[in-house]
Structures are given as C-alpha cells and as structure tokens.
C-alpha cells in the first residue's frame, strides 16, 4: 500500500524569485451569481424525502377501526347525559349554584347530616356535598324574565325598532307641561275693536 503525502506548492527549495501565487480552481469567475441561482435538476435519480423513505406504503393494508373508535371515544369524553343527569334526577331540579348555596341559603341542606365524618380509607370527609346537590328550582329572582320581556318585542309588533327607541320610550301625555297662552289685549292707543 502506498501512502501519498501532500506536498507544499512552495517548498523551501524553491528560490524566492520564482514564487508565484497559486490560484484555486474554485475561484468564482464570470457570472457566478446568476449561475448559482439556476436550478439544475438531478437527472440520475429523483431525490427522496424522509417520509417516502421511512414510511413504505402497504397496498393491501386496512386501517384498524377498533383502535380509532377507542381513541375517538377517549377524546370526546363522557356523553352529555352522564355529565348532566345526577342520580336520574331531572336537570331542572338541581340548578342551585354554589354561590347561592353559600351566601343566600347559608349551607342549608336537609339531606346531609350536620357533622361529617372522616373516612380513613378514602381520606375524605363523608358525605361529600358535591355528591348530594341541592334539589330545587334555580334561584333567579325573575331578572331573566324581566329582561327578556323588555328585550323581545311583543308578537303583534311588526315594525322593528332601534335600540335607542326601545330603551327610551315616549313618556305619557300627562307628563308633559301644557302650553298656556294669554288672551291678546290691544294697546289702548289703537282704535277700539268694533263690536257687531
């Protein structure tokens, strides 16, 4: 096996008067900026993407529908009926909010004992108040119905009113001050008005 050693182009034996600059073959000459931007298509082989190389298609393969179904079920979560229904109680019976329970009803709940016990196995105070929601109609003091009656026009009204017109109704006629006029009296220096 023969090893080649790189020889310096200007060795120490070269006289100084023969020293000439050596140019590289990779010197950029001519229209190198324009030629650099030209697209040269690889004719020997079309370049392959990573996806095409690593993921080979299988023509007879069918997707696994069962795993798709399980993943879809996991992403969607529980259906609406399992989230809203509680002990098969109708949803309009337990719409009392926690705020209303704490501040207006003062934690009054007839179904729960006054003192809860500590469960050492579950590490919880039982019974939990969240498991036994307050049953009853929602407390909404009629504000929603009042605003709904104000916002929605009566069914017999066909003309659409603007928000300004509906917000500022016309006051009744009795609220306005009546304009009263004095009886005109002619000045005395003029001729008297003839009477017939």
Curated annotation (Swiss-Prot):
Segments for region (Mn 2): 96-108
Organ and tissue specificity: Expressed in trachea multiciliated cells.
Stretch list, region Disordered: 168-196
GO cellular component labels: axonemal A tubule inner sheath; axonemal microtubule; sperm flagellum
Keyword Translocase: no
GO-annotated biological processes: flagellated sperm motility
Subunit structure: Microtubule inner protein component of sperm flagellar doublet microtubules.
Identification of the protein by name: Cilia- and flagella-associated protein 107
Lineage: Eukaryota, Metazoa, Chordata, Craniata, Vertebrata
